[in-house]
Design a protein with these regions (language model features):
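Adenylate-forming
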Residues: 218, 251-280, 307, 325-328, ...
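Gly/Ser/Thr-rich phosphate-binding loop
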Residues: 71-74, 86-189, 202, 286
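C-terminal boundary motif of the adenylate-forming
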Residues: 244, 281-307
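Conserved ATP-binding/catalytic segment of the ANL
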Residues: 197-264, 281
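Conserved AMP-binding/adenylation subdomain of ANL enzymes
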Residues: 8-25, 32-132
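Residue-level signal for inorganic ion chemistry
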Residues: 73, 150, 203, 250, ...
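Conserved C-terminal "lid"/linker of ANL adenylate-forming enzymes
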Residues: 287-289, 320-376
Length: 376
């Protein structure tokens, strides 16, 4: 149960973090049944006096962006992942264009980090209108701010858009907190993190590594379910989020979901989210999910156009080399058909429904484990 006070406190706090201007136009992409969109894509612009334009459907988003020319977009990472994939696909045929795109992103990223010298800044100013301009024009040509939440943002995606000159801010929240808990600021943006807590929101990490939240936006409780409420909300008002996290220099870094932890047959625990994010940094992988609960090793389910398992294992190994030795992919199940919302394999914010995906491919997973490890 979210009260008017819960929601309005969240709206007021969000507007202290993100600036909306009188000339802005916000495009709404996500379902209004989701609290992220309801607060950030509806109540926040309403409070700021900013008009909201609604896309007809995700499949018509490109046309709507060109027509509406929004300045602000609130979306889940998957929207930008798809957009970037299309850009990279278009560049694949021209090594020169691909090289110029990569150079522009690299220079823009160095500028964002404050590490660009005078020559690099001059070169970026030269390349940006010629390389970044045409790409950002596909987003309508006026987009100045992208607020991303609802699922983890890949660093590769953030780096690409920020490098092109778009301000992309990752935030974090959950429905039980109305929903925004934290967010990066335009003047203090660290895409590795989800930013600092909103004004008035307190956070801490308990002994189990789980993020706890307290503040005026935290729910009253679950409807007619005192037992479920007591399980996540203590007498002091601390809400158990179910997310594993670290707090570094005041910023929150989400490490995964407590319920998603995979316990291997040797008792070692693996948080799949960080590993999956690292894998998605490789353009070869479109969608991924690690499995291995109660098993001796991990198997990767990957939506990809590559069919050679040895190639896929090598790419996975390269992306996971900095992880512990237990986070190693020994087999890959290559899948051509993407996981979709219509099929019931994604949430409304386009996060993978792990149980649903596992159930769909259960027989193939069992078969792979029966056949054992493949030597690369």
């Amino acid at each position: 149960m979210l009260s008017h006070r819960n929601i309005l406190s969240n709206v007021a706090a969000a507007l202290e973090v993100v600036s909306l201007h009188p000339g802005d136009v916000l495009i709404s992409v996500l379902p209004l049944s989701h609290m992220f969109e309801r607060t950030c894509g509806y109540y926040v612009p309403l409070k700021a006096g900013v008009p909201v334009a609604y896309t007809r459907s995700i499949n018509q988003l490109a046309e709507d962006l060109a027509f509406l020319k929004p300045t602000v977009m609130v979306a889940v990472p998957r929207v930008f992942q798809r957009f970037l994939a299309r850009v990279e696909q278009a560049l694949a045929a021209s090594p020169l264009k691909r090289a110029l795109f990569s150079l522009t992103v690299a220079l823009g990223w160095r500028k964002f980090e404050g590490r660009a010298g005078k020559v690099e800044q001059s070169l970026f100013r030269l390349l940006q209108p010629r390389v970044a301009g045409p790409v950002l024009n596909r987003l309508g040509g006026r987009l100045r701010l992208a607020v991303v939440g609802g699922a983890p943002l890949e660093l590769r995606v953030a780096r690409s858009f920020i490098g092109l000159g778009l301000s992309m801010l990752q935030g974090y929240g959950l429905t039980e907190a109305s929903p925004v808990v934290a967010g990066n600021r335009e003047h203090d943006n660290d895409p590795v993190s989800v930013g600092a807590p909103l004004p008035g929101v307190a956070v801490r990490v308990n002994e189990a590594g789980e993020l706890l939240v307290r503040g005026p936006s935290v729910m009253l409780g679950y409807w007619h379910s005192p037992q479920a409420t007591a399980a996540v909300l203590d007498a002091e008002g601390w809400l158990n989020t179910g997310d594993l996290a670290e707090i570094r220099a005041g910023k929150i870094i989400i490490k995964g979901r407590t319920k998603d932890i995979l316990v291997l047959s040797n008792g070692e625990k693996v948080s799949p989210q960080d590993a999956e994010m690292a894998l998605l940094d490789d353009p070869l992988f479109e969608q991924v999910m690690l499995v291995g609960e109660g098993r001796a090793y991990l198997v990767l389910l990957a939506v990809t156009q590559e069919s050679d398992e040895r190639t896929l294992i090598k790419h996975a190994k390269a992306r996971l080399k900095s992880f512990s030795r237990w986070v190693r992919v020994r087999r890959v199940i290559a899948l051509r058909e993407p996981w979709t919302l219509a099929e019931g394999l994604l949430t409304t914010t386009l996060k993978v429904k792990r149980n649903a995906v596992y159930d769909k491919y259960r027989e193939r997973i069992e078969s792979v484990y029966r056949n054992g490890i493949r030597t690369v």
